[in-house]
Amino acid sequence: MYQENYEDEEFAGNIDVVADSYVNSNGHDEGDYEDDEHLQQQAQAGAQAIPEQVRKFLGHLYRNLLSSNVSDLAYNYENQFGRLSEKYYAKASWPEPQFVAALVGDDGLFLTLYRELYYRHMYSQLHPTLEARFRSFENYCDLFNYILNSDGPLELELPNQWLWDIVDEFIYQFQSFCTHRSWLNKRSAEEIELLKANPQVWNTYSVLNVLYSLIQKSSITQQLVAAQDGADAAALAAGEFGARPLYKMLGYFSIVGLVRVHCMLGDYTLALQTLENVDLNNSRGLFTRVTACHVTVYYYVGFAYMMLGRYADATQAFVHILTFVARTKHYHQRAGQFDSVNKKAEQMYALLASCVSLCPTRVDEMVHSALREKYADQQHKVQRGGDEAVEILSELFRFASPKFITPNPPNYDAPEETVVEPQDFQLKVFLREAKLQLVVPMLRSFLKLYTTMDLAQLAAVLDVGADELRTQLMVYKLRYRQVKWAGGADLLGGEVVPTTDLDFALQQDMIFIAESRVGRRYADWFIRNTNKMQDLINSLETRQKNFIAGVGKPEPAAETKA
């Protein structure tokens, strides 16, 4: 498991180091062709070939960027870009950046942002070549160098959704490149030489450097600390750069991005430490401004807790965000975001099924109903223990876990060497803890049927020896209590509390069982179903009003002739 800690000061300052052009195998650079008349003619022809609707979109996007019209930019980005992608570029890339340059007067900033969209679409719909992966990294370096290395704050303003997507896509492409690089047996000799000659491209240090630099430049950590103390964060801690929404939100989203990267590397303790100044109890926190960011925070927090064996905290995190998703699913207007949120929700249901099976606890009834519908059979099998339980936990983990990466490149001189898949390694880490925990649901299912029971009788039921049963009971006792987060900034801290409703005492060969029953919350059930009924009544009343207003208004009867 990757455990190296990166401190903020290690990544301070200029990040020009990550922006070096990579060495292409043919020895040429893009600048060699800038004055080529033939290429200029091709660019003009390519610009004319762009569909009229797309050219209008690019023109509006360019003008709104120049005028810092954030609301119109948000509409262009969140609605029009997706619709045009589906209409014209469902199975093709967007127009080449050099063709678009002719439409916007070679504006460098706009073209850098356009390339970010261009490569993002390529990653989502096509199979990017190694050359495209290198170019995309180079473009991100240009963008982040422009933002971080300016003498003063930029006047640039972008919608929060776009800023989040920039950070999120940057990390996704890093993960994708690491996976692509590790499969040397699928790479050609030329590609291997290109990878070997460019170790700085999508380097782990470079990616962490960018995220830490954005955090430092925005002073977002100081702003969050000041906000917890009740101070005016913007005035006291933001500084010249952090007062601008561009830097503030990029810095904040980079904190969430770091949580994701640390989980991908397998350092779950550092992932939770990264969020020490983020108040997850604040329903108006900055992470709630973008739904995808909100879901991402709780997904990785819950996953980190699960990998640390804190199943009660993981359950709490998953239930919180799944409840939010269930209650707001009708308000997601953007199809792309709706699909990604739903996909992540399905993964969290699988992880929640594992956590609740290993550490039985009560959850919100709405989430419990959905969980039972999706994974009732798997949960039942896990609670019985045995090899079948391990197999099911493995399947759920492979489906729902994030994509792990190996931070170091493979041995390019020996491509035939077998490399341990990081996904398999992290699965072993999870199962090592889960196998010890399996005794809890198995014993609980038998003990809850009795108030007292003879040790030999239970051993006969379980078909194990008395000594082995004593060992299992001691394991249950140890697993019965866990550290549980009690709120506050320290996600790693908490109180040692019981995590299940059943305890026991062993005296000689007699087991005395005590179960703490929690009364059913009937009020919640009535309130929820009353709200559903009210929504149904409102919907019917609206339809009735529309019908009366003219939709179903009867036509006047025609006069009959005598």
Language-model regions: role of each:
Residues 1-562:
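Extended alpha-helical scaffold regions
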